[in-house]
């Protein structure tokens, strides 16, 4: 329990490579999620009975070659893990035919690294402050430098930056509660969530809408409460909790457009098991 508390708020997605003496298993890869990398690699190498995965049990020893972290919560990390594992099914990755199968003579590690490289270039992941940590020098690869550009839609939003107070919902065009009315209501009673006016996390975006309108727009099948989504005006990615916090007056949310280096490549070869 203490070891988990020491790395509170750490959410990582890692890549393992098998160094099994058995040619059948050597070179196989495994992608997983963890809050404690040191504990997790030990579980994998001790087998399924010790908490390791069935797919890695008795097929090692396994080496954790890299881990991606910096996710805002476990949901975001788990979605990244799933997409990396399932490029043929992922809504974003399945549109890239070059990622649907390994190239000729490409190893499992090289294939997974190629998928990871493309994932870090696309939204929503290229807007997160992700860190890639390397643990094994022999597998270390340089990421191809490619300058990340702001989506065209985000530039269009700047033209309307002066519209700080909206009276109509951007989505349904219905009336919104004015800022002055909200302040008066706050003095008399606690606001209900349905009365909130939601605004984009991007300071230059003029989006203003009802809670229920945005929720209906970004709600995924099987969800009761939204987790994340893309702004219908500027296409900026957001976490639902951050949108609600901003509507409630929190001011510690950073504008995504200020993140000029959202992906940090941090080589750490002396960390590991």
Curated annotation (Swiss-Prot):
GO terms for biological process: double-strand break repair via homologous recombination. Keywords: DNA damage, DNA recombination, DNA repair, Endonuclease, Hydrolase, Metal-binding, Nuclease, Nucleus, Zinc, Zinc-finger. Its cofactor is a divalent metal cation. SUPFAM superfamilies: GIY-YIG endonuclease. One of its GO terms (molecular function) is crossover junction DNA endonuclease activity. The keyword Phosphoprotein does not apply. Its EC number is 3.1.-.-. Its main location: nucleus. One of its GO terms (cellular component) is Slx1-Slx4 complex. The keyword DNA-binding does not apply. Residues 9-96 form the GIY-YIG domain. Pfam families: GIY-YIG (PF01541), SLX1_C (PF21202). Belongs to the SLX1 family. Forms a heterodimer with a member of the SLX4 family. Catalytic subunit of a heterodimeric structure-specific endonuclease that resolves DNA secondary structures generated during DNA repair and recombination. Has endonuclease activity towards branched DNA substrates, introducing single-strand cuts in duplex DNA close to junctions with ss-DNA. HAMAP family: Endonuc_su_Slx1. This is Structure-specific endonuclease subunit SLX1 homolog. It comes from Anopheles gambiae. The lineage of its organism: Eukaryota, Metazoa, Ecdysozoa, Arthropoda, Hexapoda.
């Amino acid at each position: 329990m203490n070891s988990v508390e020491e790395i509170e708020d750490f959410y990582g997605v890692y890549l393992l490579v098998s160094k099994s003496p058995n040619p059948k298993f050597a070179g196989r890869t495994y992608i997983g999620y963890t809050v404690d990398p040191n504990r997790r690699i030990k579980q994998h190498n001790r087998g399924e009975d010790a908490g390791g995965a069935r797919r890695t049990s008795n097929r090692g020893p396994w080496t954790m070659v890299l881990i991606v972290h910096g996710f805002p919560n476990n949901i975001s990390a788990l979605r990244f893990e799933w997409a990396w594992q399932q490029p043929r099914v992922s809504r974003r990755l399945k549109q890239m035919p070059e990622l649907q199968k390994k190239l000729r003579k490409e190893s499992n590690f090289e294939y997974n690294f190629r998928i990871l490289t493309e994932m870090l270039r696309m939204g929503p992941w290229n807007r997160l402050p992700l860190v890639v940590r390397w643990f094994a020098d022999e597998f270390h690869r340089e990421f191809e430098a490619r300058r990340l550009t702001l989506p065209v839609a985000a530039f269009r939003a700047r033209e309307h930056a002066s519209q700080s107070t909206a009276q109509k919902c951007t989505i349904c065009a219905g009336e919104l509660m004015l800022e002055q009315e909200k302040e008066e209501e706050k003095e008399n009673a606690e606001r209900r969530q349905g009365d909130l006016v939601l605004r984009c996390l991007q300071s230059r975006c003029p989006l203003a809408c009802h809670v229920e309108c945005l929720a209906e727009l970004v709600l995924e099948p099987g969800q009761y409460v939204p987790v994340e989504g893309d702004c219908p005006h500027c296409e900026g990615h957001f976490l639902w909790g951050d949108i609600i916090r901003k509507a409630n007056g929190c001011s510690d949310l950073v504008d995504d457009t200020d993140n000029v280096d959202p992906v940090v490549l941090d080589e750490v070869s002396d960390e590991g098991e």
